[in-house]
């Protein structure tokens, strides 16, 4: 029964991973290897939400059995009086859980250190053959692997100086410790951001005025990046097009390679940048001749991939921001004037329920949720700073877990552990899904994420899986070698697989000292927005309230949104006129056809009239047709105002 319950939980994670992958990427347009690798990385990273609390509950069950056996061995109390240890919900044998952890851990490690970095370089390589892309990916990652090999060698030499015997088991522990140490530093950075920004984002989400101003600012900030990306793509496309037209024959397969480069420019991109499909030739033949070599074509291909990727990211972000600004403006207008908010129909949720949510429930719900997450943030921070104190149970996470196991039943610790691990994962993964690295990494929730960004997110998630588990077990005093507690007596299956960091003394002691300090320091930096103020003062655009430059950008963003609104309005009116004009033509054509047929039938058995009278009648019919076909208003040319 426990195995079936675990299988159901894993299936739920499978559905959640499929939903997220479909939400953030276009599966049909991606390389299947990229999709499969990313899915596995995300899936194993989300599995710990259910597997780790189950491991904790089963460990408490083993502790209960050990305590019961100790009581039976040291006292003369009859066996029926000593309470039996009840199996936790979803109990599975230790070997099943251990094998599951082994698959999850080593698959995540192989993905994050070997497969995913190679795939990242593969999808961005400019080579034209599969072998060439693989070769370029290996060369690009050579420096990457060399640096990490040197770090592992340094840790190995340090362990030898400390007297650690170098055998297979210790080598595995040293390798795992080195990987987890890097993951812990990454976790500290992500938690330092997520523990502060998640409650702040929820609180601001309930403030529509703030959201609208922030959206205006982001639109103005993105406008210059989008314009720069468009100009870059235009320049590259002109060069590639002229190069393709200059090659009259396919000598050495060069024309075929240039055609491959041209295929990277989709029809949507070309229609957006060149509405009239006229490419102006600004490149001289001398400049074009430099691109005829293999190396130059590979470099041009790589630049094309990067430029198109940057433009697609900017366009996707632009559409999301403009739609958000228009919706918030409509919402504010409907509330201030007492009108009902006009919403598109949805199959799942009725319009009335959605309107009530946006106008009445969203703000108080987000504020309450923000207060709850603030409490959870202080709960986690205090636990991080006190988990190494074991003389008394000071860590709130350890205290709640122990209280649930002693006061109620140890099986309730599974629910407590589930709540804590969900918040930790939410804060860490919130940063990953919201993170934006300029022109390199951005996850778009509307399915426009490029392959490089989706692979980079899988690398981060796989790298975070073991550190999150290790940090959580230390917070609740379940890893004795982290918390230095010696009285628990049993270990989780995760700890049995991983080993302990105390094989390397500097790592074992450093976690207790530097991990809490770094998290508190980063949380303070993000809370006071030190980084934003520093970047703002040195010239980078940052959203700073009550700042003149920020207000100017907000006003500029509002003007851009108004331009987009007018453009959409003209487009809708033009479509309505065209549709009305089409319906009018269809109706008049049908009426004219019926009149002619009726005329022919009525004249079939009558005597022939004079030629002049017949000509006058046909001229009258023709004149009527011409008048009905003449539109009362001349339709505007398609896209005329949009081009302006």
From Swiss-Prot:
Bias type Low complexity, positions: 578-594
InterPro entries, alphabetically?
GPCR-associated_LMBR1 (IPR051584), LMBR1-like_membr_prot (IPR006876)
- GO CC, any one term: plasma membrane
Q: Where in the cell? A: Cell membrane
Which positions are glycosylated? 73
According to the UniProt topology, which residue ranges lie Cytoplasmic?
28-31, 124-145, 194-369, 434-453, 524-644
Q: What is its main location?
A: membrane
Q: Which Pfam families match?
A: LMBR1 (PF04791)
Identify its membrane topology class.
Multi-pass membrane protein
Q: Which UniProt keywords apply?
A: Cell membrane, Coiled coil, Glycoprotein, Membrane, Transmembrane, Transmembrane helix
For this protein, the parts annotated as crossing the membrane are 5-27, 32-52, 103-123, 146-166, 173-193, 370-390, 413-433, 454-474, 503-523
Is Transcription regulation among the key words of this record?
Answer: no
Q: Does the keyword Glycoprotein apply?
A: yes
Indicate, by first and last residue, each region the UniProt record lists as having compositional bias (Basic and acidic residues): 567-576
Coiled-coil region(s): 216-245
Provide the family line.
Answer: Belongs to the LIMR family.
Q: Which PANTHER family does the entry mention?
A: G-PROTEIN COUPLED RECEPTOR-ASSOCIATED PROTEIN LMBRD2 (PTHR21355:SF0)
Q: What is this protein called?
A: G-protein coupled receptor-associated protein LMBRD2
